[in-house]
Amino acid sequence: MNFIPPQDETRLRAAASGVLPNGKPVVVNADGTVSVAASTNNSQIVGADEVFESATIAFTCSTFDSNSNKVVIAYEDKGNSNYGTAVVGTVASNDITFGTPVVFESATVGNMGPKAITFDSNSNKVVINYADEGNSDRGTSIVGTVSGTSISFGTAVVFNSSATYEIGSTFDSTNNKVVICYGNGGDGAQGYAIVGTVSGTGISFGSAAEYEGGESKYNSAAFDTVNGKVVIAYMDDADSDKGKAVVATVSGTSISFGSIAVFNDAITNYVGIDYDSSSGKMLIAFKDKGDSDKGKAVVGTISSTSISFGSEAEFEAGQTDHLSVAAFSAASQVAVFYRDSDDSNKGKVNMGTISGTSVSFAGAVDITAGTISLSTAVNDTNANQLVFAYKDDANSNYGTANVFQPAYISTNLTSENYIGMSGGAVSYTGSAASTGSAVVYNSGASKFQGAAFDSNSN
């Protein structure tokens, strides 16, 4: 082995684990050795239908608890006096299993959108937001703590003293706040948002602020981790049912808004949104009633307190209903789960890939054979699989869920473990070959950005 000249700062020496072919990306391993970056071909998987509630359900929403690595689904249990209920799901072996459902509100609950539940990663708590019909439909929140396959709750707190509609929520990880968006029945169902702070098993709120002066429906929210902004997407019932979005900024316990932007000029239903960390963009999906009820999506780009949109893309040519959106970071894609009402009301998913201000879709995949409604989608970032929950109309309206994994190539190459390109294959024999020999490689650029490595091309 030749010594590296001290003045050559672009070449390094390290102990190799395995052979390093010439000109390949090199990563540092946990034991300090280095190896060529590896990739894995992941096949498409559609898991079996798994029942989480053997009764009719409504108002389904879901989130992923990254502290316990569990999926939490909240819903109205019509088999138990319409009580608000939640259940913990564990994803493993391409399937999902559930613990025992737990009541969080002993009264009829309602008006929970697909994202009416969120996970606070600062306090490691789940927050469920709902209309409490046992208390004049007031907007109410409750904090849940996951332990094993169960969940326990603190005391419910009212965030809106009037009737509350079409609830969405997200977690602002920059400010460690929960943001809830909703239609305020005390003010003509206009769009309002409020900031919540979780402490222990409770939550407190600042003052609500209006983001839409007309009646706001299908309220949904997502958080942009790069810009530190919340985006609320909705239908403006007072402006020809157009699809609109607004950027929100959290400061302390207050929230303010930029200018409202239109993403669809026609009648818009079933609005869903999520943030794609791979592209740094928002994806909004919706039903376009101005174009034969097709499923459409649009990419949103945040600049300061404004959002702009690229061209619409179609993910479903048939009538699209009951949709939900979930980013799938493992494949740098975004999933749109929905009901295809022109194809036996099946539950389907279409995976979108964002490039610039555009999104392209891979093609619809059947998740269910029968009718579904009230769907919600969530990404289990521990198992790297999506979970779709819904009311299974084909099976007595039971609460049901499926695991889904799209076909994609994964790699162990990241911006944190990449250290350069190999400068040449090294021959070594004897015990050195198994323990790792010192090899020379070129460190090259100090940063790795957004590339994929195919080990089959070695």
Language-model regions, residue ranges each:
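Glycine-anchored, exposed beta-strand/edge motif detector
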Residues: 1-48, 409-458
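Extracellular, repeat-based ectodomains that mediate carbohydrate processing or recognition
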Residues: 41-410, 429-458
